[in-house]
Each structure stands twice: as C-alpha cells, then as structure tokens.
C-alpha cells in the first residue's frame, strides 16, 4: 500500500523531502505554479483538484503539466455525484482521459454510471455519515483498485491500494487531534 503525504506548501514539501518521504499528494490550488520545481524530489506525485477550484484552470494544468505527476484526480464536487459525473464526461470530451475518477455519494451507483474497466484505479470521495461510508465500502467490487481520499483511518481494511493524509492535515489545522496508539 502506498501512503501519499499531503504537502500544500513549500515548508511541508521540504520537511517531507528531508524525512525521506517518497509519495506526496498536492492540491492544484497550491502546486500549479511550482510543481516543476519539486517533481524530481519524489517518486510519485498525486494531484487533486482540491476545494474551491476552477475547473478550467485545473484542466489546463492537467494538460500542460502532465509530465510532472503520476496520478491526477478528475475535477470533482464534494457530495455531488451528478456534478462530478458531468466533469468526468467533459474531461473525456476534452481528451483528458488519464484522470482518476472520484466517487461521490453512493459509490456503487456512481460506479454503475462510470463503468470503469477491470483493474482501473478509482478514488473514494465523500459520503455523509461514517456508517454509510463503511456500508458503501463493503459493497465495492473487488475487480477495481482504490485510493482512499482522506481515508487513512481505514488503512487496516486492505481494500485500498493507496490512501493519503488529507484527514491528518485537516485535523492538525483545526488544532484538534487524537493520538493513535495502534490498538
């Protein structure tokens, strides 16, 4: 399993590099201007559209900086499957056929709309409620690969090929945290 560390500013990127981190996740909002300066410092860069993004700017970034990242999510809208599907289709029409789809809301219904090829990588986005999230994760088909966006809490579930530390960062920024003891 790959763990992608979120790094959305220069200081965090430098600290992660000094710690020997190999995989980073970057928000377009914070990386569009300087991804070419640090792409060779990490083995794998995963780009996400982030919140409050501009779809046109993100799509231009995806096309112009493709050689600097390994993975990039599609432009998605939190909790909104229909809007997320609309952007997925637009990207395909624009020739941006390498983005990783992001499931929002009802994962299985969203998958039925996408119809990804077996062994495709798919990101799990937002669902309201932890019970619903856990139920939806149990129903996921086994013929796909999954990245858990801010789903590192479920690292033991073993359904994910990769997860990221977005949830860790948001907790740290909120100045509220719990210490995980591994039990």
Range-by-range predicted roles:
Residues 1-89, 174-183:
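Non-catalytic, usually N-terminal nucleic-acid engagement modules in DNA/RNA processing proteins
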Residues 2-4, 21-25, 41-46, 69-73, ...:
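Structural preference for beta-strand elements that scaffold enzyme active sites
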Residues 16, 48, 100-101, 158:
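Conserved, mostly hydrophobic/aromatic
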Residues 38-48, 89-96, 132-154:
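Alpha-helix-loop-beta-strand connector modules within alpha/beta enzyme cores
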Residues 60-63, 109-114, 142-144, 151-165:
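Catalytic cores of alpha/beta
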Residues 67, 94, 106, 111-119:
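Alpha/beta enzyme core
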Residues 83-88, 108-116, 132-138:
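Distinct, well-ordered alpha-helical segments
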Residues 126-128, 133, 151-153, 157-183:
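Glycine-rich phosphate-binding active-site loops on the catalytic face of alpha/beta enzymes
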């Amino acid at each position: 399993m790959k763990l992608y560390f979120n790094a959305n500013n220069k200081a965090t990127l430098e600290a992660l590099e000094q710690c020997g981190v190999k995989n980073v996740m970057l928000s377009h909002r914070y990386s569009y201007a300087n991804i070419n300066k640090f792409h060779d410092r990490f083995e794998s860069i995963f780009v996400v559209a982030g919140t409050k993004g501009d779809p046109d700017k993100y799509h231009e970034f995806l096309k112009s900086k493709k050689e600097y990242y390994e993975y990039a999510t599609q432009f998605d809208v939190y909790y909104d499957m229909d809007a997320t599907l609309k952007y997925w289709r637009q990207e395909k029409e624009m020739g941006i056929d390498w983005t990783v789809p992001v499931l929002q809301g009802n994962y299985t219904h969203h998958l039925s709309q996408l119809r990804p090829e077996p062994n495709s990588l798919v990101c799990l986005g937002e669902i309201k409620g932890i019970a619903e999230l856990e139920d939806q994760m149990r129903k996921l088909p086994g013929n796909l690969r999954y990245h858990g966006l801010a789903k590192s809490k479920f690292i033991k579930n073993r359904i994910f090929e990769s997860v990221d530390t977005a949830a860790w960062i948001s907790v740290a920024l909120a100045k509220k945290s719990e210490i995980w003891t591994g039990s």
